[in-house]
From Swiss-Prot:
GO terms for cellular component: cytosol. Coiled coil: none annotated. Keywords: Aminoacyl-tRNA synthetase, ATP-binding, Cytoplasm, Ligase, Nucleotide-binding, Protein biosynthesis. It comes from the Bacteria. A motif ('HIGH' region) lies at residues 11-21. Gene3D superfamilies: 1.10.10.350, HUPs. This is Glutamate--tRNA ligase. It is found in: Cytoplasm. Its EC number is 6.1.1.17. Pfam families: Anticodon_2 (PF19269), tRNA-synt_1c (PF00749). A motif ('KMSKS' region) lies at residues 252-256.
Length: 484
């Protein structure tokens, strides 16, 4: 194995980039970059029935969007390709033949039905289901008989008995497995396609992968992969198994969990910022020293330390994600945020599909009002409802404000001045409110709160003169006149 750090993220194109897989990719990326190593993407595409047509493209597209630039993959061959498992059969076949020739593997002709009967009987006896080795020592005559019946064999690895398989996990510490608890397992399916645990060990060896960092749901795969390494006399890579991601109920994050968006594409579509999502995911199961939580990609690379990967489950905190993204939104220029929000404004029919310059100018002012509050670009639609919907019925607190003794006088003065105001812009609106203050003697909360409630129906909100400008003269006058 090379001294150079080489890690891999190996997705299957059977689905889109899940938040858990994105974390696996991200930690591999940070580990590689921290040690000036290589971040490799390998596509495990042997499950042809479940592969999505755009699954591979989607994986690459969303990894790139997150800022995870790879050093090697299907588009960057560095001498370790092919990078799709489906194109590596010529590498696997001689090794399969070698295991058969050395009696480290054998053909098994049992049908799915026979295996299921065995499995059910073991469960009924309270045993862990495992293959019982019925075809581990077939005679040549028996093999010929099964083939004459048209049975297609799978190929099983002959698991050495009474052995302990141990590895020093970079997250969990020492982990051991007793080989007697592992039945002879399939390395090649009946259709001739190598299974995951066989192919992945071969690929990691030939691609000189130094470290395998993945979710702890892969721990049980590790002894099988070590068996393959030992069968060929190869040195295994180092292993690290990250803790699970859990939801608010502290249950494993599931793709069926309706409370949490599961896929990077969904956050992208809502208008989250890639650097914010990078930051949030980097803190799922890893923590820096100190209290700071906002870091750039370059800072994460510099401070990343695999020893700080947590053994405890990582809590997916939606409020924390909203806060992190808001920190980044506040730092962005308004034009960037507006361009992210524009598709959402168009989809909600708040800006025409083919907007005029006037529409775009109005949209930019709207974003400027709410940018510091926004958790994601798409949130502009619910945040700014007062600009598009009829005024809601006032709450008790708002009603008390609008029923104030001086309100009719205030509204009469403000209405007449705003009605004559040209241009209807922030600077002029500010002047007008000051004039009303001088003429009526009403000031402070007695001045601003009734105006805000009258034009927005709310006690709090963005800067009042800016809000009045964005609402527009017609809407503001219509709302004021009922309180004159």
């Amino acid at each position: 194995m090379s001294d150079r750090i080489r890690v891999r993220y190996a997705p299957s194109p059977t689905g889109y980039l899940h938040i858990g897989n994105a974390r696996t990719a991200l930690f591999n990326y940070l580990y590689a970059k921290h040690y000036n190593g290589d971040f490799v993407i390998r596509i495990e595409d042997t499950d042809k029935k479940r592969n999505l047509e755009d699954g591979e493209t989607s994986q690459f597209d969303n990894l790139k969007w997150l800022g995870l630039d790879w050093d090697e993959s299907v588009d960057k061959d560095n001498g370790y390709g092919p990078y799709r498992q489906s194109e590596r059969q010529h590498i696997y076949q001689p090794l399969i033949d070698q295991l058969l020739a050395e009696d480290k593997a054998y053909k098994c002709y049992m049908t799915e039905e026979e295996l299921e009967v065995e499995r059910e009987a073991q469960i009924a006896r309270g045993e862990m289901p495992r293959y019982g080795g019925q075809h581990a020592h077939l005679t040549e005559e028996q093999r010929q008989q099964f083939e004459a019946e048209g049975r297609q064999p799978s190929i099983r690895f002959r698991v050495p008995q009474n052995q302990t398989y141990s590895f020093d996990d970079m997250v969990k510490g020492n982990i051991s497995f007793d080989s007697n608890g592992i039945g002879d397992w399939v390395i090649v399916k009946k259709d001739g396609i190598p299974t995951y645990n066989f192919a992945v060990a071969i690929d990691d060896h030939y691609m000189e992968i130094s470290d395998v960092i993945r979710g702890d749901d892969h721990i049980s795969n590790t002894p099988k992969q070590i068996m393959i390494y030992e069968a060929f006399g190869w040195e295994p890579p180092r292993f690290g198994h990250m803790s699970l991601i859990v939801n608010e109920e502290r249950k494993k994050l599931s793709k069926r969990d309706g409370q949490i968006l599961q896929f990077i594409e969904q956050y992208r579509d809502l208008g989250y910022l890639p650097e914010a999502l990078f930051n949030f995911i980097a803190l799922l199961g890893w923590s820096p020293e100190g209290e700071e939580e906002i870091f750039s990609k370059e800072e994460f690379i510099k401070i990343f330390d695999e020893k700080r990967l947590s053994k405890s489950p990582a809590f997916f905190d939606k409020q924390k994600l909203a806060w992190v993204n808001n920190q980044y939104m506040k730092q962005k220029d308004t034009e960037t945020v507006f361009q992210l929000a524009l598709p959402h404004l168009i989809k909600a029919n708040l800006i025409p599909e083919v907007p005029s310059e006037e529409d775009l100018s109005w949209g930019r002012k709207l974003i400027a009002l709410y940018q510091k509050e926004m958790s994601y670009a798409g949130e502009i639609v619910p945040l700014s409802e007062m600009f598009f919907k009829e005024m809601p019925a006032l709450g008790e607190e708002e009603q008390q404000v609008i029923n104030g003794e001086q309100v009719p006088e205030l509204m009469t003065h403000l209405f007449s001045k705003l009605e004559a105001l040209e241009p209807f812009e922030v600077a002029e609106i500010k002047k007008t409110i000051k004039e009303v203050q001088k003429e009526t003697g009403i000031k402070g909360k007695q001045l601003f709160m009734p105006i805000r409630v009258a034009v927005t129906g709310q006690m709090h909100g963005p800067e009042l003169p800016n809000t009045i400008e964005v609402l527009g003269k017609e809407k503001v006058l219509n709302r004021l006149k009922q309180y004159k």
